[in-house]
């Protein structure tokens, strides 16, 4: 039987910074390293503009929950 590695949990992304691809009010795309991720803003955070820095607060499925780095939570 072949070894099937378990993909790493997305929890490793929590706390990482990413950049907004195109500004959005509720959901949109962010770049973390070389990868693009679907993201939703933390309630009460945003809107964000293109190239804003966001921080990953949590994950839900393959969607990241983020807040703008300058927002205070």
Q: Regions from the language model: what does each represent?
A:
Residues 10-11, 22, 46:
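Residue "hotspots" at secondary-structure boundaries inside conserved domains
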Residues 1-12:
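Hydrophobic, low-charge alpha-helical segments
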Residues 66-73:
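Short, compositionally biased
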Residues 36-47:
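Beta-strand/loop nucleic-acid-binding surfaces
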Residues 14, 21-24, 58-60, 70:
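A generic structural motif
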Residues 25-30, 62-65:
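Short aromatic-glycine-enriched beta-strand elements
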